[in-house]
Design a protein with these regions (language model features):
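ABC ATP-binding cassette signature C-motif
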Residues: 1-207
Length: 207
């Protein structure tokens, strides 16, 4: 199997406390790895360095195989409280068709002429299949009101939207920090099934 990730000599400290120092490892294509350690030992910091959110204290290198897509699910994913669920999903997926966002906004506006133009744009692009895929993933995660604002969601609902965004990226490498926090057992079982079936490479932190 090809090496998807090479990590060399990364370190992280907070004040006088060293979380980890000069650690190196490889993760190969198809690996599914769970990192289990006590709280406060640097698990989340490690994942954030790998995802490019934080930096190693003393240099080192994090190198992913060229051209693979990497998706990161943070333990507490920030979101825009004014976004609808759909707008939040779209804002995290730069490769989606803009026609789809315009269509959803046209439907909400009740403007028939705007809707007519939006439908034509959807027909001319891949908008319908993208919309169907988004709705299917959100429904599987029990999120059905795409017009609901993110600020109105519970912690568990917001986490499910973040998971949907991750799934819709179709990334080859997933980095997940405590993915089951705030989730009901049926959603946890759905996520476990998805990860088992997926051919993605996985590194996650869990209890």
């Amino acid at each position: 199997m090809a090496s998807y990730l090479q990590v060399e000599n990364i370190s992280k400290s907070y004040g006088d406390r060293t979380l980890f120092s000069n650690i190196s490892f490889n993760i190969n294509e198809g690996d599914k790895i769970a990192l289990v350690a006590p709280n406060g030992t640097g698990k989340s910091s490690l994942l954030k360095i790998l995802a490019g959110v934080e930096h190693s204290d003393r240099g080192g290198e994090v190198k992913f195989m060229k051209d693979i897509r990497v998706a990161f699910l943070d333990q507490m994913t920030p979101f825009n409280p004014e976004h609808t669920v759909f707008e939040e999903v779209y804002s995290r997926m730069s490769d989606l068709s803009p026609a789809l966002v315009e269509y959803e906004q046209a439907v909400a506006s009740g403007d028939s002429k705007r809707l007519e133009r939006a439908i034509a744009a959807m027909d001319a692009s891949d908008g319908w299949s993208i919309e169907q895929n988004i709705r299917q993933v959100l429904t599987s995660l029990k999120i059905e009101r795409m017009e609901q604002r993110m600020g109105e969601l519970s912690g568990g609902e917001a986490k499910r939207v973040a998971i949907a965004c991750m799934m819709l990226q179709n990334a080859e490498f997933l980095i997940m920090d405590e993915p089951t926090n705030h989730l009901d057992i049926d959603i946890i079982e759905y996520l476990e099934g998805y990860l088992q079936r997926s051919r993605c490479t996985l590194l996650m932190v869990t209890h």
